[in-house]
Every structure is written in C-alpha cells, then in structure tokens.
Design a protein with these regions (language model features):
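Active-site-adjacent loops and short helices of periplasmic peptidoglycan-processing enzymes
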Residues: 21-178, 182-191, 196
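Structural signal for terminal/edge beta-strands and the immediately following C-terminal loop/tail
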Residues: 410, 422, 451-455
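Domain-terminus/edge residues, biased toward the C-terminal soluble/receptor-binding domains
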Residues: 157-161, 171-174, 178-417, 425-437
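Sec-dependent N-terminal signal peptides of Gram-positive bacterial secreted proteins and lipoproteins
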Residues: 4-26, 416-430
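Cytoplasmic C-terminal tails of single-pass
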Residues: 435-457
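Membrane-entry signal-anchor segments at the cytosolic-membrane interface
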Residues: 2-6, 409-411
C-alpha cells in the first residue's frame, strides 16, 4: 500500500513538472496591435520593442502637425522669429481648409502670438494655424510644404511626402510609422514642444477680433478626460492625435515610468461601438495604453556583455610572437530583454571584416561586428575591436611581399617572357657553340690532309 502511494505521488510530480516549466517559459506574452501600423521604441536608446508594418506607407492625418511645429521651433532657434512675435491671419492662409476640420475659429485679420498659435495647433489641432505660421515663416504655404519635405529627407525619412501643412487628406500626402518616429524624436528635443503637447488645456486671451478668451481642451484622451472618459494613462506625456476617414485614428505618444521612457506610434486604428450598443471605443488610445503596459511589464534592462570580456580569437598572419589577437566588444552592452530571456540565452553572431588579419595589429583596430539575438530578434549590435597590439615579423612580411610581387599577373607574364628569352638565349648559344666547334673540326681535318704540289724533275 505504501509503495503504491509513493508511486502515485511520484507520477503526480512528473505530471506537474511541465506546468512549472510552462509558467517560467510563458512569462513573456507576445503582442499584436489592433491597428494598421505601429511602433514601440525605448526613447533613450532607440531600441525597438515592437513594430507592425513600420515601413508601410500610411496617411498621417494631423500627426503631420509635428513636422509643422518642428519647423516653427527650428526657425525660432535660428532667430528668424520668436514665441512673442505677433502674426496676423490672412485670407490666403484660411482658404481651402475643410469646413468640418479641426479649428480654433481664427478669422482673417485676427492677430495672435506664435506661442498662442502653437498651442492652438498642438492642443486642439487647429488646421488654420499651420497655414498662418507656414506663410509667416516661408512666405507662402507652398514654400513651407517644400521645406517640410526637405526636412523629412534630412531626418532620414525615406517614405514620406507632404502635400500640405495640416494633414488634411491628399493621396500624395503619406508617411510611415518609422518616419513619424524620426520626426517626433527630433521635435521632442525642444522642451517647449513637449510642454505644449502635454498640456491638458490652454486659454487664448481675447484678441483684436474677440471679446472673450478661448478655452482649448486637448484632443489627447490619454492626458485629458475633458472630451472622453476612461482613457487617461497616468504615465503618458503628449504627444499628438490625428484622424481622417482615410487615415483612421492615429496617435503618437510617450510615457515615462520610473527611469524608463517609451515612444509609441499607432496608425490606422478604428473607432468601434462595443457590445452594449452605447460605449464607443477609440482604439488609437486603448491600443497605445495596451502597448505601453506590455512594454513596461514584459521588458527588463539587463547587462549582457562587458567590453572587458573576450569574445573571439581572430587568426593573425605575419607575426612571429603569436598567431591570434583577442577581439572584444567596443562598449559595455545592456539592452531591454523580454522578461523570460536571460543574457546567457542570447545567440552571439560574429562577423569578421577579414577571416585572418595581417600584423601589425594595434589595440582598438576594428576586427568585425557582434550581433546578439534571440529567436531571430536582434537585441544588440556592436563593433569588435582588437584587445592588444601584435607586432609584425620583418622576415615573414618580406617573404609575403616577394610572394605577392611574383603572384601579380603582369609579373607572371614578364617572368614567363624572361624565362623564354633565357631559354632561347641558351639554345642560341648552344647551337652557335656547336656550329663553331663543328666548323673548326672540319677546317682542322682539311688542314691535316693537305700535302702540297708534287715537284716534277
């Protein structure tokens, strides 16, 4: 009876073992974004934690205004205008804007400061402010849009083309999640940009065309519940919303939790009515929150490699003191890893510049690259450098140089020609010598047989 109990307990333990291992292995959860395209990036290092169709062209809607604002802040840095400059709206700046588009209800002849216009642009996405500031900076909206495209190219945006400064739909107005990240990253370098983008509200004082102040409330539900409840994300900081029927619902946001800072891009999300038939869910916000939680909860920063650690021995030629040099990482490497991946689980892939290096080698010489990956996902890349000096042997170097000299095609051809000439010369000399000896023998024989004329008596 006792034995049966022991056997039963043992079998039960064996059955439970897979459950324990499953708990450990499944600590990391995969993520699937419910939108056309998206991106989650660690802001400080640029590490990509998640991407979906990141290089696929999409319509950006009012996310365009991040580039518009960037050019304004760069013009301020260049001294071409200031936040306190007064700008008057023109008829041309207001022409062609959609009547149902986002607006701060600015009218022709109305004067505001650059700072007030930027708040209208980034907090309530007012379309007219983009044209007003574009005209003020570049002389015309068309010239400003041309500058937007030039700046996109300068930032490395390979799949972006702007047709206007507002983001209103145009089939030739497109970008990608990755390109928008590049633009946003640059704009975030301006503290005032982030200050405005993270503002829940703003009051525009009375102007020359209004008697009362205007209250602006952010269109970003992650930082303000004034327009809709249930979306506020406590770690969110900005940045910009956008939507058109063609673009869907779009959002670029950042979030800070502790010492960690992330940037997200969501393009082409939907607005849906839930099963209760009443609640409307705007997925650009809910998916952004879900993606932030996934990134913060399932990635851990770990030290994976020290620059002092040897990585590989690289063969060295032309040295009499050693036949290898030690390669090491150019820098200490730490990276965000899924919470079920330990540093020792990373696969190391070494790509050498040359399979064998010739001495002399100096410490710090580039030998190749090291890639750290797991399940086909690359988590870090770095250069491999020589750890120490390796001197060259003059004898081995000279022998190599001589060998290389005679290995050259032209030298080979000349060598064959010279050899043939030598052979021809030897043959000629030999034949000439033989002929000479043969002729000498004939003359000698003829001379020895001559008796002269017989005398007659």
């Amino acid at each position: 009876m006792k034995k049966r109990r022991l056997v039963s307990l043992f079998l039960s333990f064996l059955l439970l073992l897979p459950l324990f291992s499953l708990t450990s292995a499944d600590a990391y959860e995969s993520f699937d974004l419910d939108a056309r395209a998206g991106l989650l990036i660690e802001a400080d290092t640029g590490e990509i934690l998640y991407e979906k169709n990141a290089h696929q062209e999409n319509y950006p809607a009012s996310l365009t205004k991040i580039m518009t604002a960037l050019l304004v802040f760069e013009a301020i840095d260049e001294g071409r205008l200031s936040l306190n400059d007064s700008v008057t709206a023109t008829e041309s700046a207001l022409n062609g804007l959609a009547s149902d588009g986002s607006t701060a209800n600015i009218v022709a002849g109305e004067t505001m400061t650059v700072e007030q216009l930027l708040n209208c642009m980034l907090i309530v996405s007012a379309n007219e402010t983009c044209n007003i500031l574009g005209e003020y900076i570049s002389g015309s909206v068309e010239a400003f849009v041309a500058r937007m495209n030039d700046r996109a190219t300068e930032l490395g945006c390979e799949h972006t083309h702007f047709a206007n400064a507002t983001g209103l739909h145009n089939s030739q107005h497109y970008t990608t999640a990755w390109d928008l990240y590049l633009i946003t990253r640059e704009a975030m370098k301006h503290d005032k940009f982030m200050e405005i983008c993270n503002s829940k509200s703003y009051t525009v004082p009375a102007t020359n065309m209004t008697e009362k102040p205007r209250e602006l409330h952010s269109t970003n539900f992650l930082i303000s519940n004034w327009r809709a409840r249930g979306y506020v994300y406590r770690d969110a900081q900005g940045i910009k919303t956008g939507s058109t029927p063609e673009a869907g619902y779009c959002l670029i946001s950042s979030a800070v939790r502790g010492s960690r800072h992330m940037i997200s891009v969501v393009l082409g999300a939907e607005r849906v009515t839930l099963e209760d038939g009443v609640t409307i869910l705007t997925r650009s916000f809910s998916e952004t929150s879900r993606m932030f939680d996934w990134g913060f909860d399932h990635f851990v920063r770990r030290d994976v490699l020290s620059s002092a650690d040897p990585v590989q021995e690289v063969p060295v030629a032309l040295s009499s003191e050693t036949n290898y040099v030690v390669a090491h990482a150019a820098e200490d490497i730490s990276c965000l890893l899924p919470d079920n991946v330990e540093p020792e689980m990373l696969e190391r892939t070494v790509t050498l510049t040359n399979e064998t290096v010739d001495a002399p080698v100096a410490a710090g010489d580039l030998l190749g690259t090291l890639t750290l990956s797991y399940n086909d996902t690359v988590y870090a890349e770095t250069q491999l450098l020589a750890l120490n000096d390796v001197s060259a042997s003059w004898f081995l170097t000279a022998r190599r140089d001589v060998s290389d000299f005679f290995a050259k095609p032209l030298v080979k051809i000349l060598s064959v020609v010279v050899l043939l000439l030598i052979v021809a010369l030897v043959v000629y000399v030999t034949m000439f010598s033989r002929r000479r000896r043969y002729g000498h023998r004939r003359r000698s024989r003829a001379g020895s047989g001559y008796r002269g004329r017989r005398r007659r008596f």
